[in-house]
Design a protein with these regions (language model features):
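Motif I (Walker A/P-loop) of helicase-class P-loop NTPases
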Residues: 56-65
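Conserved Walker A/P-loop ATP-binding site and its immediately adjacent core
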Residues: 59, 72-96, 289
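Conserved C-terminal RecA-like helicase domain
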Residues: 90, 99-101, 148-151, 276-377, ...
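Conserved RecA-like ASCE ATPase "motif II neighborhood" in helicase/translocase motors
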Residues: 105-152, 160-180, 380-381
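Conserved P-loop NTPase catalytic core
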Residues: 117-119, 147-153, 165-273, 282-284, ...
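C-terminal catalytic or substrate-handling cores of phosphate/nucleotide-
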Residues: 256-282, 287-292, 447-552, 556
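Conserved RecA-like P-loop NTPase helicase motor core
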Residues: 359-436
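C-terminal accessory/interaction regions of large nucleic acid-associated machines
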Residues: 401-425, 540-664
């Protein structure tokens, strides 16, 4: 049997046939087109996108097995710079890839002695010292240079990208990863993430722009963004006061609050799960990135537990539990008996079986991993993100709001996503402003996914968010190559080009000089026939934004304003008449394309032509990265040259970058 067959068989033997089928689909969609015909002389970058905690690792392992069947023998599996996650990944690889040689960070001798007898997987943290060490290790062997590396970068948007792209130099991790690729004559570098925003906005020149993108859908039973963060608040979200997190720690006599309700919710949920035969139930508290606040919240939870233990016989305490039990029954009708649950909780407390674990950089590896059995309350910050999984996580108290929120970072902290949860007993406690942010992120995530599925390899993905919410950290984006456009701003070309004025005349002949509601697809067809002599206005970019809206809603409408016989000078600093500007501004939530046909006087050499002015929906910021070349050239022409000219990393011209509030 092949490596892939063995892997799939092991999954089926565990009773997970649906997962096996999903992995087979991913493999059959990717391997024949991109792995089987690998040239063994190029360096190819690809992107595998899956929802947060949706089973990306299983699909990664499936693709690695399929690659081994195609002749790849040297694999590097990268994790974020987190001991817990690296060890979690290493142990899982040992278990799931039992016919591979699995190497830890200190297993160089094991790797060399294996000498390609089995496919080898080296599991490494993205740590500068570790990566440099393994770059030297790989270079020192006599079998790596002539055989391609298959590098799988889990959470590739974290640490791997060049954080100094705007300083004409290269960050340490990014440089080390590039040098690891250089240890061999060819490689496949598979970026894997649930938050691809920063990767989608990379340039081709950077070497991290994926040639192809694949999205795999989560399996049955997955609870993700659409479950927790639809446009309207679902019953699984419990809204807390926006300032509660600060007030709780500052006021020792703080009355009944969301944290206390969340704790009792966890206790009752745990009682139901454990009395129903379960082995674990977890409660996650994410208050801040500050470790002193982690300690403060852990102590506050301890105080609440002591209060319950001292007063459990009092009617007021039992009534408080009963009120929360009744709220849980609104979504979980078949709960265990209340009195039985209450007795179980008190027994667990009396016997000190409820664990409070603080997970942060000051905790040891052993302290950070004791949450797979029993009733656990986990408190932490950054250690709770990026790939660390918590079994049977049913209750979350999330109150961290960044001053300048980034969509990808926030989404990675959404540890409530996953499979092994009881959906009817899920509860997430958060303030309204956090729910709104998560809901906005979820909407854009769905639009990104639809673009990936609809586009040719997902090469031209457009991203937009409400003002104040950024897609990612700015230090990994080449500011000269990422277009930033503001909703509500009018954009038009100084020097417009009509590719085919007769075709434009024909399309627009059905419209008088007036305003019309039209399908956005018509606006994209008009944009196909327009351009600019210079790089001040890019029709493809605006078309890309509109296509992202159509991906969400194929019948989406926009406004088309037609004006003819306009006598406007070439290169004018303004285009719209005051009345048309006012008219367009009335439609704040729609795309507005105003198109003027000029007489040809005043610098146009007597030639009539159409001039477009486009306004994107307001209160949002739109981001455009650099698409892969689409000129019909073969794939091999667009592999990445690893001899990067670092003096020119940030000098590629922008298609158009404007983030102001005025016309140009």
């Amino acid at each position: 049997m092949s490596y892939l067959d063995n892997y799939i068989e092991r999954i089926k033997n565990k009773g997970n046939r649906a997962l096996a089928d999903a992995i087979n689909k991913t493999v059959s969609d990717i391997v024949p087109q991109y792995i089987s015909n690998f040239s063994f002389r190029d360096h190819v970058v690809s992107l595998l996108v899956g929802d947060v905690q949706s089973g990306k690792t299983s699909h990664m392992f499936g693709l690695m097995c399929a690659a081994a069947d195609e002749g790849f023998v040297n694999f590097v599996l990268l994790t974020t710079d987190n001991i817990l996650l690296q060890q979690q990944t290493y142990k899982r690889a040992e278990k799931d890839l039992s016919d591979f040689c699995i190497c830890d960070e200190n297993d160089y001798l094991k790797f060399v002695q294996n000498n390609m007898k089995k496919p080898a997987v080296i599991v490494l943290k993205k740590n500068g010292r570790i990566l440099k060490q393994w770059k030297n290790n790989l270079s020192s062997t006599n079998f790596v240079a002539g055989n391609p590396l298959f590098i799988v970068d889990d959470e590739a948007d974290a640490a791997s990208l060049n954080t100094k792209v705007n300083k004409n130099t290269q960050s340490t991790i990014n440089k080390n990863l590039e040098e690891i690729k250089k240890t061999t004559t060819s490689s496949v570098y598979m970026e894997v993430t649930g938050t691809p925003q920063s990767i989608l906005l990379q340039t081709v020149k950077s070497g991290w722009k994926p040639y192809f993108i694949y999205y795999f859908r989560p399996g049955k039973g997955y609870l993700g963004g659409n479950f927790f963060f639809p446009p309207e608040v679902p019953p699984y979200i419990v809204l807390t006061d926006n300032e509660e997190a600060t007030d709780i720690l500052n006021d020792e006599e703080f009355p009944e609050n969301g944290l206390k309700v969340a704790l009792v919710t966890h206790l009752l949920t745990s009682a139901h799960i454990m009395l129903s035969g379960g082995e674990v139930c977890n409660f996650l508290i994410h208050p801040s990135m500050k470790t002193d606040q982690h300690k403060g919240f852990a102590e506050k939870i301890g105080e609440y537990l002591n209060e319950i233990l001292y007063s459990y016989e009092e009617d007021v305490t039992k009534s408080f539990f009963k009120s929360i039990y009744d709220k849980l029954k609104e979504t979980k009708s078949k709960m265990v008996d209340f009195n039985e649950a209450y007795e179980y909780i008190i027994d667990q407390m009396k016997n000190d079986r409820i664990s409070i674990l603080v997970l942060n950089s000051f905790s040891s590896y052993e302290e950070n991993t004791q949450y797979d059995k029993g009733l656990n309350i986990l408190v932490g910050g950054n250690s709770l993100g990026r790939g660390v999984t918590f079994p049977q996580l049913q209750t979350i108290y999330y109150c961290r709001v960044a001053k300048s929120p980034q969509a990808d970072t926030m989404w990675q902290h959404a540890r409530m996503f996953g499979y092994d949860r009881d959906p009817d007993l899920m509860r997430v406690f958060m303030p309204p402003k956090l729910f709104k942010l998560f809901s906005d992120i979820n909407r854009t995530n769905n639009i990104i996914i639809k673009q990936i599925e609809n586009a040719n390899n997902g090469n031209d993905i457009k991203i937009f968010y409400p003002t104040g919410l950024k897609p990612t950290r700015k230090n990994v984006l080449d500011k000269k190559s990422v277009g930033v456009y503001s909703g509500g701003v009018n954009y038009f070309p100084f020097y417009p080009v009509n590719k085919d004025i007769n075709a434009l005349d024909e399309i627009l002949s059905a419209f008088e000089n007036d305003i019309y509601s039209v399908n956005l697809k018509l606006i994209t067809r008009i944009l196909d026939l327009l351009d600019s002599e210079t790089e001040d206005w890019n029709a493809k970019v605006f078309k890309g934004f509109i296509n992202s809206m159509l991906a969400e809603n194929p019948s989406a409408q926009g406004k088309l304003i037609i004006r003819r016989n306009r006598d406007i000078a070439k290169g004018t600093g303004t285009l719209l008449s005051p009345n048309d500007r006012k008219l367009g501004d009335e439609y704040k939530e729609e795309v507005v394309l105003t198109i003027y046909k000029v007489t040809g006087n005043k610098g146009w050499n007597g030639k009539q032509l159409w001039i477009p002015n486009i306004k994107l929906p307001g209160e949002s910021v739109y981001y455009s990265g650099e698409g892969m070349p689409q000129d019909g050239s073969s794939k091999s022409n667009y592999q990445y040259d690893l001899k990067v000219d670092l003096d020119k990393v940030s000098e590629s011209p922008a298609s158009y970058c404007c983030n102001n509030k005025k016309n140009i």
